């Protein structure tokens, strides 16, 4: 068996398990739109929230999902968000059905009562986020962050990175000055010198390194996992598992393609993001491909994230991460 054939079998096995019941419906030959019409629904679509980077951006750029779902009479609507927290706000209020975010946004959303479910994740990618300082900064170690102003997007993956970085350095969270800004505003503040450091993720991280010559004080390696999660509203996931199965299968195909075509990935991402190809090539070199079901190990990792925010009273209440899974599809096995 060839490596490429083994990859295809692995992808089919993994994603078949994700929505086995849906696969049975699809195998019966009844298109999704016909099923919807039988339920009295007029239009079937999936509204996808994405950020300006990653597998969903590649999927949008290649147009393969639209072609696949058109065969089932299903439309696709894409909405861009600047960061994970606002994307999940969109999911919670019903403006989108599905999207991808980092580790921390689902924790904040679940603690706020959002009715979302995890449906998959990409592998850990700790080098894709970092705390950076201006090229001429005198800050040399994480301990030097004490008393400093640090720009970050509240409730994002880098919020957790900052917690773990400070913990490693023995600096209390109360002893820094977090400045909560979305990426574009944070970059402006960083360039003006209004903040001393910036916790940020790719491709904004790569842009800061390439365009501003920002210096990495610490990235996520040895501190955080930095998984990328695919989430859906619980209502949509329960009602349309067959559509989500198709979406995740197409995500897996794009992951396989992206892993083997870095130059084409950089070309598509440059066009989609408006960033230079050198910037997105650097960012893409740190990205990990390979969507999987959410395993017990990943859920345990997410629970540690939740507990860290809860211990500092940064979320309104403790949460149990596994409550945000569909019970019949938890797939409580460790990821291979």
Identify the function of each model-found stretch.
Residues 23-35:
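C-terminal segment of classical bacterial N-terminal signal peptides
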Residues 66-74, 290-298, 321:
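Short, solvent-exposed loop/beta-turn-alpha elements that line the ligand-binding surface or hinge
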Residues 46, 55, 147-152, 192-195, ...:
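Second-shell loop/turn segments in exported
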Residues 239-316:
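Secondary-structure end/capping motifs
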Residues 307-336:
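Conserved C-terminal helix/tail region of periplasmic/extracytoplasmic solute-binding proteins
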Residues 37-171, 177-180, 196-200, 217, ...:
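Short, glycine-/small- and polar/acidic-enriched structural segments
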Residues 104, 178-179, 184-271:
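Pocket-lining segment of extracytoplasmic ligand-binding domains
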Residues 2-21:
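N-terminal secretory signal peptides and thylakoid transit peptides that target proteins
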């Amino acid at each position: 068996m060839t490596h490429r054939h083994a990859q295809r079998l692995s992808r089919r096995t993994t994603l078949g398990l994700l929505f086995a019941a849906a696969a049975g419906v699809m195998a019966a030959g009844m298109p999704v739109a016909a099923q919807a019409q039988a339920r009295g629904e007029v239009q079937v679509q999936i509204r996808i929230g994405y950020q300006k980077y990653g597998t969903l951006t590649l999927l949008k750029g290649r147009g393969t999902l639209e072609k696949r779902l058109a065969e089932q009479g299903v439309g696709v609507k894409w909405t861009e968000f600047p960061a994970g927290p606002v994307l999940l706000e969109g999911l919670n209020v019903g403006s989108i059905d599905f999207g991808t975010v980092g580790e921390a946004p689902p924790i904040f959303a679940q603690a706020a009562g959002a009715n979302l479910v995890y449906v998959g994740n990409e592998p850990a990618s700790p080098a894709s986020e970092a705390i950076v300082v201006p090229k001429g900064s005198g800050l040399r170690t994480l301990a030097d962050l004490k008393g400093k102003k640090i720009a970050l997007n509240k409730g994002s993956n880098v919020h957790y990175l900052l917690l773990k970085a400070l913990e490693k350095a023995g600096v209390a969270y109360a002893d820094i000055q977090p400045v909560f800004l979305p990426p574009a505003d944070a970059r402006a503040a960083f360039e003006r010198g209004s903040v001393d450091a910036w916790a940020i993720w790719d491709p904004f991280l790569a842009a800061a390194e390439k365009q501003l010559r920002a210096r990495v004080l610490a990235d996520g390696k040895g501190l955080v996992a930095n998984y990328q999660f695919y989430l859906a509203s619980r209502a949509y996931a329960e009602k349309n598992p067959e559509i989500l199965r198709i979406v995740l299968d197409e995500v897996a195909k794009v992951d396989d393609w992206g892993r083997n075509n870095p130059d084409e990935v950089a070309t598509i991402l440059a066009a989609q993001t408006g960033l230079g190809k050198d910037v997105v090539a650097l960012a893409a070199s740190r990205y990990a491909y390979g969507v999987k079901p959410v395993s017990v190990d990943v859920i345990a990792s997410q629970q540690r994230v939740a507990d860290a925010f809860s211990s500092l009273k940064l979320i309104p209440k403790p949460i149990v991460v596994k409550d945000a899974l569909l019970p019949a599809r938890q797939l409580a096995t460790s990821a291979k």
